[in-house]
């Protein structure tokens, strides 16, 4: 899968390296199967020390773009499932010896990814790159399938060799697990090399990039921004919350719409595109997505898990209700 997906890597802002790396260099023709067994596992390790506000802003602005790019990938006609995990490090509010904190296990819940990203805050601290890579390798449930694409992206601006865990050992362990460690230095390219960020990538067969983390992303407004955002809001009305998760997750969906809109209308547009893609699946709380994943789901659904307005309906009536929502 890697030989199909990996392409020339160039960067100018955070997430551009990731977007370029998940773009397919070749697409395999064939019938598209959205129920793929292939995975893209992507872990992002954020330096949240006090100088990294610009880095987080760039990440918030580009999240939905990388999701949309990964949704265009095909492997033998299959659409790989995107799983994202997240850590932050180098922050004094992290109360452990190595200043490393897991924010998110691997998940395909993109609203949850967005919520965690927008909740990150910066504060001064010590940045231990080897330690955060080591934790990500040990604590996450990595795929054992060699055909899956597994990548770590670590971003920061302090020497890569700091801390109690030797980065060369952590990166060698990643290489043994067939995981690429890609490093993003927030500063001058040559300074990043002097501070071992290039070596950190090379020892795991990954790639080294540098960015200006304070650079503002320029978005070009289009005449369709308002219309697309209106459609995004209409999409929300087709979601039918069920079980104990439903109400809270539907509220989260609206909050992440708002977060994207606050960044820029173009960011909201990219999120709207995500919401009509196969990557945006919410079967854990949405009746319609659950049915799309398993057409027998309605027959097994417990009545107490239904929303109030649907509790008295038969399985056949629920089927008709879902069919209407699908057409919307």
Which sequence ranges carry the predicted segments?
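C-terminal "exit" segments of structured domains
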Residues: 204, 208-297, 323, 328
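Bacterial Sec-dependent N-terminal signal peptides
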Residues: 1-27
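Compositionally biased amphipathic helical and low-complexity segments enriched in hydrophobic
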Residues: 6-11, 57, 113, 288
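Short linear sequence motifs
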Residues: 7-8, 82, 273, 284
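Divalent cation-coordinating acidic motifs and surrounding scaffolds
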Residues: 19-215, 223-225, 293-303, 309-311, ...
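Generic low-complexity, intrinsically disordered sequence content enriched
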Residues: 9-14, 67, 291, 322
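Residues in flexible loops and secondary-structure boundaries
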Residues: 9-12, 60, 125, 219, ...
């Amino acid at each position: 899968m890697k030989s199909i997906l990996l392409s020339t890597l160039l960067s100018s802002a955070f997430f551009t390296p990731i977007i370029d790396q998940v773009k397919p260099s070749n697409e395999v023709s064939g019938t598209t199967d959205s129920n793929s067994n292939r995975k893209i596992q992507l872990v992002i390790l954020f330096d949240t020390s006090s100088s990294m506000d610009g880095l987080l802003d760039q990440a918030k602005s580009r999240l939905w773009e990388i999701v949309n790019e990964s949704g265009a990938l095909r492997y033998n006609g299959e659409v790989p499932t995107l799983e994202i995990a997240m850590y932050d490090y180098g922050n004094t509010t992290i109360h452990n010896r190595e200043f490393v904190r897991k924010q998110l296990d691997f998940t395909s819940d993109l609203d949850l990814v967005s919520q965690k990203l927008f909740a990150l805050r910066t504060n001064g601290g010590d940045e231990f790159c080897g330690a955060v890579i080591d934790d990500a390798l040990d604590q996450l449930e990595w795929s054992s399938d060699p055909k899956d694409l597994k990548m770590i992206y670590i971003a920061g601006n302090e020497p890569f060799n700091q801390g109690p865990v030797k980065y060369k050992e952590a990166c060698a362990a990643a290489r043994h697990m067939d995981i690429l460690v890609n490093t993003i230095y927030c500063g001058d390219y040559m300074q990043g090399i002097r501070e071992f960020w290039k070596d950190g990538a090379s020892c795991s067969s990954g790639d080294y990039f540098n960015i200006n983390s304070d650079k503002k992303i320029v978005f070009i407004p289009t005449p369709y921004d308002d219309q697309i955002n209106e459609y995004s809001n209409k999409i929300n009305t087709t979601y039918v919350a069920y079980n104990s998760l439903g109400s809270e997750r539907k509220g989260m969906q609206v909050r992440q719409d708002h977060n994207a809109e606050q960044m820029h209308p173009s960011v909201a547009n990219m999120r709207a595109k995500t919401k009509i893609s196969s990557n945006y699946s919410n079967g854990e709380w949405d009746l319609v997505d659950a049915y799309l994943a398993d057409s027998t789901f309605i027959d097994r659904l417990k009545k107490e898990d239904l929303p109030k307005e649907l509790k008295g309906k038969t399985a056949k009536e629920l089927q008709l209700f879902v069919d209407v929502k699908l057409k919307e």
